[in-house]
Amino acid sequence: SGSRSTAIGKTTTASGTSSTAMGEDSTASGWYSTATGRNTIASDFGSTVIGQYNSSGSSATSASSFSTSAPAFVIGNGADSSNKSDAFKVLFNGDTTVSNDLTVSGDVVISSDARLKSNIVSLGSTLPKLLQIDGKSYEMKGKQKIGVLAQEIQEVFPELVSEDDNEMLAVN
């Protein structure tokens, strides 16, 4: 396997330089990466993947050199090789994805200080646009929710909507 690498378990592979793979059918191919669990793959430089059947980090963004857009830490929660998924993902640039509900018992504080922002442009009167947004009651992942639909926000405030790697929309 890789130089100065360690593989422990059933059919594990540590092919990246100074990488570690543990568990069953896990692969650490990125340099300095770690894959632990069942069918986990850590293919990016310095990445750590735990759990089973992860989808992020399973194809290299950058295997032998550091990239801020690559996954730093992933918890895989897939069912099998045809149904790979991630419960949690943190990129080296700090972007974080939680794939289900996030429960916080303390405060969530989001910085909005004008001193942190640049190129500030007024949107003008936004009240007429806000009145076009219709709140909804809906079911999501088996739970009753209240909120808005990203597609409706996108029609009125397209700059507030982004798309993830799976083409799912999110509201900022």
Task: Give residue spans per PLM region.
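C-terminal intramolecular chaperone/autoprocessing and neck/assembly modules of extracellular spikes
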Residues: 94-172
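Periodic small-residue-enriched repeat registers in elongated scaffold domains
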Residues: 1-99
